[in-house]
Amino acid sequence: MTANTAAVSELERATMRRVAWRILPFLIVCYLIAIIDRGNIGMASLQMNDDLGLSARVFGFASSLFFFAYFLVEVPSNLAMQKFGARIWIARIMVTWGLVSAGTAFVVGPYSLYVMCFLLGAAEAGFFPGVLLYLTYWLPSAYRARMVAIFMVAIPAANFIGSPLSGLLLGLDGWLGMRGWHWLFILEGIPAVLLGIACLFVLTDRPEHAKWPVSYTH
């Protein structure tokens, strides 16, 4: 290996570290919130059942509607991401799913729950594959598997954080006259909205649009 080749290789590694620290922590937090929001209905189900008389069959059908909408909208969502750009579209996904998740606090029966679960699936569709597509814009193929593996740390982190957090929020039962499950949906939905707005300032569609140095050959 020549000195010039070694210098280029070191520059590439340094750039990859800069890219990783710039975008991965933010995307990991976004995905962590997505997983927590996706599972909060299970945590809320006992209190919701007491208040609304919802059976296990109702919750099962509501969950199936979430995944039906998710798969139905996933491909169109990713096509839209290519048209509008990753920054705007990931922001749109997060803001809409945060609003829908928070809005689930106001369901009054099985049919309104069905509607909200369907809307949540449609709103969240495209986020995970969209992030993977976004990473391909920034990372040469040699680095993608490692970076995706780091990104996936959000899954065990969400499982570790989500249950205790949801338990604490359910403990707000009676605060300001609202049930714990109301607070669970509202307070776990708000971070997605805030992170969605932050996407507009934190993310950049492609390396050539970055305002910070990205000097490697993709």
Label the predicted regions:
Residues T217-H218:
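Conserved small/polar residues in nucleotide/adenosyl-binding loops
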Residues R22-A56:
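Extracytoplasmic
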Residues W183-F201:
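Symmetry-related core transmembrane helices of the 12-TM Major Facilitator Superfamily/SLC fold
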Residues G39, F67-V75, N159-F160:
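Residue-level signature of mid-helix packing/kink "hotspots" within the transmembrane helices
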Residues V148-G167:
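Glycine-rich segments within core transmembrane alpha-helices of 12-TM secondary carriers
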Residues V100, Y111-L119:
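Paired small-residue
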